[in-house]
C-alpha cells in the first residue's frame, strides 16, 4: 500500500451507502505521484508524494 512521503496519507477504507442505506465496502486511494528529488548530499532520491502535497510545496524535480 502506498503512502505519501510528506503527509503520510495512505489508503482509506469505508462503506459506500446507497439510498436505502445498504453498506458496500470500498476503498479511497490517494493520488500518489512518483518523483525524483535531490537530497542535501546531492544524491537523487525517488519518492512517492500525493498530488496535493506536490502542488502545495512546489518541489524542484530532478
UniProtKB/Swiss-Prot annotation:
Organism expressing this protein natively: Phytoplasma mali (strain AT)
Any one GO molecular function term: structural constituent of ribosome
HAMAP family in UniProt: Ribosomal_bL28 (MF_00373)
Keyword Zinc: no
Keywords: Ribonucleoprotein, Ribosomal protein
InterPro entries for the chain: Bacterial_rp_bL28, Ribosomal_bL28, Ribosomal_bL28/bL31-like_sf, Ribosomal_bL28_bact-type, Ribosomal_bL28_sf
Gene Ontology BP term (one): translation
One cellular component term from this protein's GO annotations in UniProt: ribonucleoprotein complex
NCBIfam families assigned to the protein according to its UniProt record, in alphabetical order: L28
Official protein name in the record: Large ribosomal subunit protein bL28
Family (UniProt): Belongs to the bacterial ribosomal protein bL28 family.
Amino acid at each position: 500500500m502506498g503512502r505519501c512521503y510528506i503527509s503520510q496519507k495512505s489508503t482509506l477504507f469505508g462503506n459506500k451507502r446507497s439510498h436505502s442505506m445498504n453498506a458496500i465496502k470500498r476503498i479511497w486511494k490517494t493520488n500518489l505521484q512518483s518523483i525524483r528529488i535531490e537530497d542535501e548530499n546531492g544524491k537523487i532520491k525517488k519518492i512517492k508524494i500525493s498530488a496535493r502535497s506536490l502542488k502545495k510545496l512546489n518541489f524542484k524535480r530532478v
